[in-house]
Amino acid sequence: MSNIRPHSLGLKGLIAVLVVGAAPALGADRVTAKELYAEPPTLISLGFEWQIDGDDNHNATVAVSYRKKGSQPWKQGLPLLRLDHEQITENAFHYTTPNMFAGSIFDLEPDTEYECRFVLSDPDGVEGKAENVVIVRTRFEPKPSDSMD
């Protein structure tokens, strides 16, 4: 016969077991910010990818705002789209997306510097840099050559 009583852990022991047991679940739901990348610009748009870890419950978001460099106030952009190992198999493409957010800022002016602000938030918590401000220039409009060569 065992000499361990069924309730020998007590309330403190039960709380410790529940907290330790819940820690991995919370860690997987919390988002960890990794690298933010700017895609090659176009004349009137800028594209971005922000790689992350965690956020297994997909409730993290990235708010986007932008402005011409040095101007006020910030304009609101579309939030970045959440991607998590989606399979892309259109035409000749066979690609699996990383765990990340991605999106674009549209309707910009050619050959202009923009400050772009990205704020990562998650009800479960954010590890790493939750806000990034980057300066990116849209492409200039190509002009035909003056020479006839």
Regions found by a protein language model. Name each.
Residues M1-L9:
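N-terminal secretory signal peptides that target proteins for export/translocation
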Residues K12-A22:
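Bacterial N-terminal signal peptides
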Residues A25-A28, A33:
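Boundary at the C-terminal end of the N-terminal hydrophobic targeting segment
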Residues I44-F48:
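Structural beta-strand segments of beta-rich domains
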Residues D53-Y66:
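Solvent-exposed loop/turn segments flanking beta-strands in beta-repeat/beta-sandwich domains
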Residues A63-D111:
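Recognizes extended acidic, P/S/T-rich segments that occur
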Residues S121-P144:
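Extracellular fibronectin type III
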